[in-house]
Swiss-Prot record:
Its EC number is 5.2.1.8. The lineage of its organism: Bacteria, Pseudomonadati, Pseudomonadota, Gammaproteobacteria, Legionellales. The keyword S-adenosyl-L-methionine does not apply. This is Outer membrane protein MIP. It comes from Legionella micdadei (Tatlockia micdadei). One of its GO terms (biological process) is protein folding.
Amino acid sequence: MKMRLVAAAAMGLAMSTTIAATATTDATTSAPGTSLTTDTEKLSYSIGADLGKNFKKQGIEISPAAMAKGLQDGMSGGQLLLTDDQMKDVLNKFQKDLMMKRSAEFNKKAEENKSKGEAFLNENKSKEGVVSLPSGLQYNILERGDGAKPTKDDVVTVEYTGKLIDGQVFDSTEKTGKPATFKVSQVIPGWTEALQLMPAGSTWEVYIPSNLAYGPRSVGGPIGPNETLIFKIHLISVKKSDA
């Protein structure tokens, strides 16, 4: 996660080199006003706007005037205000500081998610129909099935919807329009534990603490570190292992 963020920032900085390599306008050409008439002006503006949006999104503070000056000086081939070694030191410090900042933000988010998840599960366990297991897994039987229960080596076919504790849906078989099929042991631990308790034909709502989901790592999208997850699972069928 940290490396991706640092790489993204470094890529943004590297794009200034791309500007110098691709733009053909003379370095002394005055900046356009509100009108962009040539392809070069449109390209230059697009690259600048894209960089600006990315810097803002990542919380990176820069001086647009100093950046424009550096771009102009680099393209002119004249004397630069900093030596190559000085610029290298500046960029290395920037990456180090950014990594530390992102790491602190990530750890803070992980602690917040963990606390919110624990509070949710603590309240949820007292709700009618909710069963709490020693592992921390919770479930509520919405529809009882009478089929076979799978083992960890069996293959199951399911329909499901996954959401965060705030109700945000992050995945669902409804998106693909078809059920999912996989081996019971090849999913997150909370799923593996719950599925082995479910008779085929059942529909359960399963509440999975972060340590039985993706833990402190972030898997991208809306699932952050230490997220408690909720799944509505309909176990359609079980294919017994040949082993």
